[in-house]
Amino acid sequence: MNAIAVSPVQHVGVIGGGQLAWMLAPAAQQLGMSLHVQTPNDHDPAVAIADQTVLAAVADAAATAKLAQACDVITFENEFVDLPALTELEETGVRFRPRPAAIASLLDKLDQRQLLTRLGLPTPRFLAIAAATATESELTALGFPVVLKQRRHGYDGKGTQVLRSLAELQQALQSYGDTPLLLEEFIPFEQELAVMVARSQSGAIATFPVVQTHQQNQVCRWVVAPAAIPGALQKAVAAIARTLVETVDYVGVAGIELFQQGDRLWVNEIAPRTHNSGHYSLDACQTSQFEQQLRAIADLPLGSTALQWPGALMVNLLGFEDHQSGYAELRQQLAALPGACLYWYGKTESKPGRKLGHITLPLSGASSTERAQQAQTMLAQVEAIWPNPDTAHQP
């Protein structure tokens, strides 16, 4: 945590009440800010830490107008919002950070791809399709395997499929009805990367270390910071992040996911909010992504994003069964691991693949090779306590 400045913003509204809003709480308290949350369920994680809660769907603009009455500024925990309605609210004086205009090209994956293309940034080839009318020539245009995505409202593996033949693709399309879809070229990457970037109202920019991420069933399983990539690639990733937030006049923290193959990069997706790949920063960086989010939207000086440890491993604690349990014994065992920083989101129901919490562990190795070996050892220790959803029920 940085030295505390007096913030001109005292009351922050957050649209969305999941764990990303919940993790804003310690930084908000340190910065002297109150948090007001709009979320549909009274058992959502952020309700427990909110100074005030508006119980309503995140796309309910009337509820957002009510939220705004108590807030100096409103930010976002997720992107499932009604953008035209928010734009109308902004015209009445409601202050959103980032502004609706800044996220307009980031909510729809087709708009993201078109933005990247206009900016000359590396992106997989893509094609917008409709399930009911797509022709065979369209479906085969990008070859196979191919990635099929919902253009909106897909997250944590929902709405994303890797398909290996025309028959598989045609079968998958039958379940989408008239949902707007995107076909993308499959990139045979060496590793997946991510970076968090913050931009303040005054235009200051800070990028966090580039990290390696590992996805399991399209859901982030673990993150290693920093990524073992050459300095030139680190600079290229930071340049991409800077270009994106400057171009759309973005204020706040955003996450950018990329593919890496040799010395080449492709932007996978852009998340206009704090992001799972940045959770390690809560303990491993001088400033967490959550403190940085609050600093950016309040136009306070951005904090240092430097690592406080040589490296870090963050492991998501994904649900491995349908159950209603707090898993107290397992959490106690995880917390006893050397250097462990454990976060439990307080969700009332476990489902396979659902994010229930995360654990961050320090890596002390002086080289990327040593840190990679440590990370594998620590991952095995975590999975000996908390089952991997893919192997939890194997004999």
Curated annotation (Swiss-Prot):
Keyword terms of this UniProt record: ATP-binding, Ligase, Nucleotide-binding, Purine biosynthesis
SUPFAM superfamilies per the UniProt record, alphabetical: Glutathione synthetase ATP-binding domain-like (SSF56059), PreATP-grasp domain (SSF52440), Rudiment single hybrid motif (SSF51246)
Pfam families linked: ATP-grasp, PurK_C, RS_preATP-grasp-like
Keyword Transit peptide tagged: no
GO cellular component, one term: cytosol
Binding site for ATP: K109, K149, E184, E185, F186, I187, E192, N268, E269
Keyword Nucleotide-binding part of the UniProt annotation: yes
GO terms under biological process: 'de novo' IMP biosynthetic process
Enzyme Commission designation: 6.3.4.18
Domain ATP-grasp intervals: 113-298
Signal sequence extent: none
Record's catalysed reaction(s): 5-amino-1-(5-phospho-beta-D-ribosyl)imidazole + hydrogencarbonate + ATP = 5-carboxyamino-1-(5-phospho-D-ribosyl)imidazole + ADP + phosphate + 2 H(+)
Family: Belongs to the PurK/PurT family.
Known function: Catalyzes the ATP-dependent conversion of 5-aminoimidazole ribonucleotide (AIR) and HCO(3)(-) to N5-carboxyaminoimidazole ribonucleotide (N5-CAIR).
NCBIfam families membership: PRK06019.1-5, purK
Protein name listed in UniProt: N5-carboxyaminoimidazole ribonucleotide synthase
Organism of this sequence: Synechococcus elongatus (strain ATCC 33912 / PCC 7942 / FACHB-805) (Anacystis nidulans R2)
